[in-house]
């Protein structure tokens, strides 16, 4: 991450040690530096602006020879079509706003990426955003980062922010309609697969809240 860190104002973890695959863990692993801060538990318009500024800096970072999204990053930022069958199945399993959910998904698939791939974090969950005195100070857990479509990094618009902060966030990242539509597809996919495979818990509560936000969003109108 040193290459990325040089281009960001917020802190990101740095590798302390790199491990190799073994019989008990068949993947490369790492130990990262610890960063101070409190995980995000509330969202404000100021945080929406902070996160937008972070993403603009991240997307402007030279991509060098970093690999594009694929199986190694669970296709975060890759083509939404990879999850087409899974999403359509989840829509039927979850039920409810089937027609509206399918309209969001179909529109997202049709909104092809118009720009070159950029750096993406891939997992901007609330727990990966650290605050200091109410402002974004660090972004952690870069295990899914890749060079790909930035739409997947806009998912916090619905998973974290309310309608007012969502509007601020969209303005901050200067998202065009197609980018925003693809982002809605990523948020829909994530919420549906949680609701289709789990019955209770904090993730289910969050997924329901995300789905409600997507259904009430007027981006399709």
Description of each model-found segment:
Residues 1-79, 114, 219:
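ATP-binding pocket architecture of kinase catalytic cores
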Residues 47-51, 80, 101, 204-207:
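Hydrophobic packing residues in well-ordered alpha-helices of helical domains and bundles
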Residues 1, 28, 84-87, 151, ...:
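A general structural signal for well-ordered alpha-helical segments in protein cores
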Residues 21, 31-42, 63, 85-90, ...:
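A glycine-centered beta->alpha junction motif in the catalytic cores
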Residues 23-24, 133-135, 188:
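Short strand-connecting beta-turns/loops that link adjacent beta-strands
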Residues 15, 105-154:
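Active-site acidic catalytic loop and adjacent metal/ATP-binding pocket
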Residues 30, 53, 70-110:
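Active-site catalytic-loop/activation-segment of kinase and kinase-like phosphoryl-transfer enzymes
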Residues 144-147, 152-221:
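Helix-rich C-terminal or lid/interface subdomains of diverse kinases
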């Amino acid at each position: 991450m040193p290459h990325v860190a040089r281009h960001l104002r917020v802190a990101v973890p740095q590798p302390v040690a790199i491990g190799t695959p073994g019989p008990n863990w068949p993947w490369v692993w790492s130990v990262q530096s610890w960063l101070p801060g409190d995980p995000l538990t509330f969202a404000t318009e100021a945080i929406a602006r902070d996160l937008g500024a972070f993403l603009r800096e991240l997307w402007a970072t030279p991509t060098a020879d970093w690999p594009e999204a694929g199986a190694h990053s669970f296709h975060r930022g890759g083509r939404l079509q990879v999850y087409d069958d899974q999403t359509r199945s989840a829509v039927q399993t979850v039920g409810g706003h089937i027609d509206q959910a399918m309209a969001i998904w179909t529109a997202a698939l049709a909104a092809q990426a118009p720009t070159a791939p950029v750096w993406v974090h891939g997992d901007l969950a609330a727990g990966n955003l650290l605050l200091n005195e109410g402002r974004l100070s660090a972004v952690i857990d870069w295990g899914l980062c890749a060079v790909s479509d930035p739409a997947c990094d806009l998912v916090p618009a619905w998973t974290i922010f309310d309608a007012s902060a969502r509007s601020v966030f969209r303005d901050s990242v200067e998202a065009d309609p197609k980018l925003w539509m693809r982002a809605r597809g990523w948020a829909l996919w994530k919420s549906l697969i949680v609701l289709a495979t789990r019955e209770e818990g904090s993730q289910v509560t969050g997924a329901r809240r995300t789905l409600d936000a997507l259904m009430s969003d007027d981006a399709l109108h």
